[in-house]
């Protein structure tokens, strides 16, 4: 069910500005593309938003575990995305191979790859398109790339663990949040100097965006389930601190005749929340979506918001006038970032150099429910992603105790006494009582009721226990599973 309040403020469509460049509306067409960064399959999924169909994937590497070979030369952990203001270049950040790959959007062809420091996270072009800033989260700097030369030109020193950069549409300031330190840096773009350091309400910011009117900066705080809002102009004061929910992931904006809105993906409870922007941001809709929503981006006219499901193997289109999901599209595995690029393909079909989804489309989706009275609202989504002979299982839990370790087991039954237990993983929760863990192994038995499972193997189940007291079961798998 969608909970919403009445939309009372009307804004003429002709005056609308859209993120990220603050431009006037560009109607949705078959020239546009939606791109999703698929971290496990090491692909970029390519969607035509005119009909909400998957066109194929750009393969940048092999799936895990093949990508872990010492002789492997492809990209690893495809994660972050950015696009040039002229829509001609897609920048793809691969965390594991320390790289950013530039792709021609009209042909889906790789133009080249630039290698940077340890564990880069996200990429963003300056509004004039002359520079590409990469946050090198595994170190302490932003790598400034000349996209024409495909070469690093300079580094901007930051606090340890810069998470993401966003620019105001006027190009004067860049804003860099941190994933390891409670600090947001304001950078003068022309001089590449930090002009202000602002306090973050908590250390882990994975995502940041500037409003298309260039008046506010919004950041997500994944560790505490909040969104922090600042002024985008001096003195850059804090304007709001919003309680949003566990595993608050990404944020973006859409303007339409109903008003100006911010959309936030809340991974722990599988919703997108819409806030009316203003002096006191107001929650106006809570939109149920697929498992572990992550990346989010508006269409060029703000009529839709696209969101990727990290544990769902799909992306969804949301109508921003009704705040209802109008389409779901299959994509690759454990998707992180998503971007919408208007007029990415000015001419032709734009399907060159694409491959079918293939094995990456073979996944199952499970649910864990509370198994006792200690945490009655606890739950988790689980994806079982086929990697061929092996599988990657990702568990995203919420509603547990904060900053605690739990044991994950495979069992013979999902009911007491659960039968034989085999240890699978350790789940660590953050300050908000939420946590995500991944494990690789021959785990299709978790989805024995679905097409991904071997027919000769009985189904096994997942339970989560208190690490200090293994008899305390906090989560157990329900019987049902869904498959793609």
Model-derived regions: residue spans:
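Internal, hydrophobic beta-strand segments that form the core of beta-sheet-rich folds
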Residues: 454-469
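Predominantly soluble domains enriched in secretory-pathway, periplasmic, or organellar proteins
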Residues: 13-378, 388, 402, 419-423, ...
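Short beta-strand segments enriched for Tyr within beta-sheet-rich domains
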Residues: 404-410
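Extended, polar beta-sheet/loop recognition surfaces of beta-rich domains
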Residues: 412-457
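Short, flexible loop/turn segments at beta-strand junctions in immunoglobulin-like
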Residues: 397-400
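Structural beta-strand segments of beta-rich domains
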Residues: 389-395
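Bacterial N-terminal signal peptides
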Residues: 2-14
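Short beta-strand elements
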Residues: 470-484
């Amino acid at each position: 069910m969608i909970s919403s309040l009445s939309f009372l403020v009307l804004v003429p469509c002709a005056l609308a500005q859209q993120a990220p460049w603050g431009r006037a509306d560009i109607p949705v067409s078959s020239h546009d593309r939606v791109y999703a960064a698929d971290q496990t399959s090491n692909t970029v999924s390519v969607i035509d938003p005119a009909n909400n169909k998957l066109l194929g994937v750009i393969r940048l590497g092999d799936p895990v575990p093949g990508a872990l070979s010492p002789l492997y030369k492809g990209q690893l952990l495809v994660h972050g995305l950015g696009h040039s203001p002229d829509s001609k270049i897609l920048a793809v950040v691969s965390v594991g191979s320390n790289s950013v790959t530039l792709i021609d959007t009209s042909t889906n062809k790789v133009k080249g790859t630039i290698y940077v420091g340890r564990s880069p996270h996200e990429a963003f072009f300056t509004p004039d398109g002359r520079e590409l800033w990469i946050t090198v989260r595994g170190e302490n700097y932003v790598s400034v790339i000349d996209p024409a030369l495909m070469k690093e030109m300079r580094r901007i020193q930051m606090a340890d663990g810069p998470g993401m950069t966003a620019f105001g549409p006027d190009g004067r300031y860049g804003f860099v949040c941190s994933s390891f330190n409670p600090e947001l840096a304001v950078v003068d773009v022309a001089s590449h100097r930090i002009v202000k350091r602002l306090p973050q309400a908590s250390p882990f910011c994975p995502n940041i965006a500037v409003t298309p009117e260039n008046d506010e900066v919004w950041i997500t705080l994944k560790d505490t389930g909040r969104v922090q809002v600042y002024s985008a102009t001096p003195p850059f004061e804090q304007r709001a601190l919003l309680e949003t929910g566990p595993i608050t992931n990404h944020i973006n904006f859409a303007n339409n005749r109903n008003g100006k809105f911010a959309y936030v993906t809340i991974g722990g409870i599988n919703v997108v929340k819409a806030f009316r922007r203003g002096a006191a941001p107001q929650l106006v809709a809570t939109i149920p979506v697929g498992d572990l929503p992550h990346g989010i981006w508006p269409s060029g006219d703000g009529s839709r918001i696209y969101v990727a499901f990290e544990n769902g193997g799909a992306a969804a289109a949301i109508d921003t006038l009704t705040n209802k999901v109008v389409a779901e599209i299959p994509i690759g595995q454990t998707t992180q970032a998503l971007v919408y690029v208007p007029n990415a393909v000015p001419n032709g079909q734009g399907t060159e150099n694409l491959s079918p989804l293939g094995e990456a489309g073979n996944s199952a989706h499970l649910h864990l429910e509370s198994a006792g009275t200690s945490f009655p609202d606890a739950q988790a989504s689980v994806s079982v992603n086929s990697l061929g002979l092996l599988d990657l299982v990702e568990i995203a839990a919420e509603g547990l105790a904060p900053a605690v370790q739990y044991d994950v087991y495979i069992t013979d039954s999902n009911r007491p006494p659960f039968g034989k237990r085999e240890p699978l993983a350790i789940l660590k929760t953050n300050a908000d009582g939420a946590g995500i863990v991944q494990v690789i192994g021959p785990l299709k038995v978790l989805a024995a009721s679905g097409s991904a499972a071997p027919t000769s193997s009985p189904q096994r189940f997942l339970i989560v226990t208190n690490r200090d007291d293994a008899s305390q079961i906090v989560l157990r798998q329900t019987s049902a599973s869904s498959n793609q």
